[in-house]
Amino acid sequence: MPKTLKISSAELVAQARAQIEEIDAKDAIALVEDPRVQFVDLRDIRERKHSGYIPGSFHCPRGMTEFWVDPESPYFKEIFGEDKKFVFHCAAGWRSALTVATLNSMGFEAAHITDGFADWVKQGGPVEKDD
């Protein structure tokens, strides 16, 4: 028998979206050439390989994000110490909304693509694929 949750995943995402910076896909596409912007792909590596990725994006597994951005963590990645605007995305914008809300609460400023990589593709954003 399924357990009753105190809050649904949809409610968590809605709460996150209410407190973070969202960038729609069209505006995000305009930033792809900006050297001051770093796109961060939270999708599973299999999603990235299957669907392609935003050119120049950095792959950061969702489960490691908080550790990779924290300079005091043994898992810290130097890219997150750069003076850039970080724009996170996933496939539909749900995981990235939750991620950015968590990162903002840690003091790490970031934004996300509202409807994710799916909308990026729909809006004609550039996509790279590895052979």
What are the roles of these predicted feature ranges?
Residues 40:
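Active-site flanking residues adjacent to catalytic metal/cofactor-binding acidic residues
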Residues 1-37, 45-85, 94-131:
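Rhodanese-like catalytic fold shared by cysteine-dependent sulfurtransferases
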Residues 89:
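Short, surface-exposed ligand- or partner-binding patches at beta-edge/loop junctions that are enriched
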